[in-house]
Each structure stands twice: as C-alpha cells, then as structure tokens.
Amino acid sequence: TDPGHLQDVXVAINDPKXGVFVNRK
C-alpha cells in the first residue's frame, strides 16, 4: 500500500508492516 494513503486523517495509524495506514474507528 502507498505510504501516503490515508483512509481517515486523524485516526489513521502507521502500521509497522511497511508504512501501511489502517483506519481506527
């Protein structure tokens, strides 16, 4: 996944698997 890909700003966290952003709700 593109490290600049944000699913939701503010709640997105940097996944240690490679800079993958995961949406936390």
Swiss-Prot record:
User: What are the UniProt keywords, alphabetically?
Assistant: Allergen, Apoplast, Manganese, Metal-binding, Secreted
Question: Is Metal-binding tagged as a keyword?
Answer: yes
Kindly report the protein's main subcellular placement as a broad class.
Answer: secreted
Report the locations given in the UniProt record. Answer: Secreted, Extracellular space, Apoplast
What name has this protein been given in UniProt?
Germin-like protein
Q: Give Gene Ontology CC terms.
A: apoplast
Q: How does it assemble?
A: Oligomer (believed to be a pentamer but probably hexamer).
What family does the Swiss-Prot or TrEMBL record give for this protein? Belongs to the germin family.
Q: Which GO terms describe its molecular function?
A: metal ion binding
Q: What job does the chain carry out?
A: May play a role in plant defense. Probably has no oxalate oxidase activity even if the active site is conserved.
PTM (free text)? The three different mass spectrometry results appear to arise from different glycosylation variants.
> Does the record carry ATP-binding as a key word?
no
